[in-house]
């Protein structure tokens, strides 16, 4: 009896060991490839929406009007994009995608948001004390933003049994910081059909 129990335990241990030896495969893929494993918001959604809305914003009348009346490129700050969807979406990656598109095109000038602006100011304060006078950056020379972009990410989920439809809507707005006027409003929608 004891020998049978030992044999059983040995076989059980070996079986579990073999099951644990399954190989995990990792493959490097292009960062701009679309891979959708779960049906949730992902990097491809963020990239596509950022590209579409950036192009829409940059090609709208507000930019040309500003250049015509001010004889310079507008300065934009990308502010808060609030996630109101049903899932955790890191809005910061989306905000950075928008900023990258703005900087990449060179059609507008972009200034830092409040968090990073404070870090830059701390560094400038340190320079006043620790850097040589020739290289210390002066106070009062920051570029003031003319426009601020902000928006929301929303979602609607409809499901029955193993099927689910998830609808995402990203709405962005651009406001003139001096007049509070909305100069551009647009949105992008994504709909995903998921079968589990």
Question: Predicted regions span which residues?
Answer:
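Sec-dependent bacterial lipoprotein signal peptides
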Residues: 1-21
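Bacterial Sec signal peptide processing site at the extreme N-terminus
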Residues: 15-40, 196
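Amphipathic beta-strand/beta-sheet edge segments enriched in Tyr/Trp
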Residues: 22-26, 146-196
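Short, secretory-pathway propeptide segments and organelle targeting presequences
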Residues: 30, 34, 41-47, 52, ...
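Extracytoplasmic/periplasmic, Sec-exported soluble proteins
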Residues: 38-49, 70, 86-90, 94, ...
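N-terminal segment of the mature soluble domain
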Residues: 52, 56-67, 71-130, 179-185
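A short, hydrophobic beta-strand-centered structural micro-motif
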Residues: 53, 57, 75-81, 130-159
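A short, terminal or domain-edge coil/loop segment
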Residues: 116-135, 159-177
């Amino acid at each position: 009896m004891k020998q049978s129990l030992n044999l059983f335990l040995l076989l059980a241990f070996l079986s579990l060991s073999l099951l644990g030896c399954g190989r995990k495969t990792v493959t490097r893929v292009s960062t701009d490839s679309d891979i959708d494993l779960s049906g949730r918001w992902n990097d491809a959604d963020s990239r596509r929406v950022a590209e579409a809305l950036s192009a829409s914003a940059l090609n709208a009348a507000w930019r040309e009007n500003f250049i015509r009346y001010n004889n310079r490129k507008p300065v934009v700050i990308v502010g808060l994009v609030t996630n109101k969807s049903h899932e955790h979406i890191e809005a910061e990656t989306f905000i950075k995608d928008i900023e990258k598109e703005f900087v990449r095109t060179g059609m507008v000038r972009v200034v830092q948001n409040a968090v990073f602006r404070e870090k830059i100011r701390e560094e400038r304060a340190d320079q006043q004390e620790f850097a040589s006078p020739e290289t210390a950056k002066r106070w009062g020379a920051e570029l003031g933003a003319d426009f601020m972009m902000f928006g929301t990410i929303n979602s609607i989920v409809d499901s029955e049994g193993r099927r689910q439809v998830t609808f995402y809507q990203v709405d962005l707005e651009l406001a003139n910081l001096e007049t509070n006027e909305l100069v551009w409003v647009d949105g992008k929608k994504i709909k995903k059909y998921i079968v589990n």
